Amino acid sequence: MAIKVRLPASINQGDLEIDAEKLTVNQLIALLSQITGKDLEKILKRDGELSPFISIFVNGRNVRYAEGLETEVRSGDEVSIVPTVAGG
């Protein structure tokens, strides 16, 4: 099995499948940077933490309420990276 990653169209056209048994979200971001050729560390992180303008979900659970960037992602998990939207 693989880790399924859903990315916004601004980062990649379509979903990706990563062949890995276990990674942290931080390691996944570094790997996705290599695969997409985009500096996702700069886009998704600010001062070593997850940017307030991005939400990352592992199996529907926001990593901010888990272990943050150290949240483990395992084979068979689904990761969604979405821009945060606000309005008023």
Curated annotation (Swiss-Prot):
It comes from the Archaea. Coiled coil: none annotated. Belongs to the sulfur carrier protein CysO family. NCBIfam families: moaD_arch. This is Putative sulfur carrier protein AF_0552. It comes from Archaeoglobus fulgidus (strain ATCC 49558 / DSM 4304 / JCM 9628 / NBRC 100126 / VC-16).
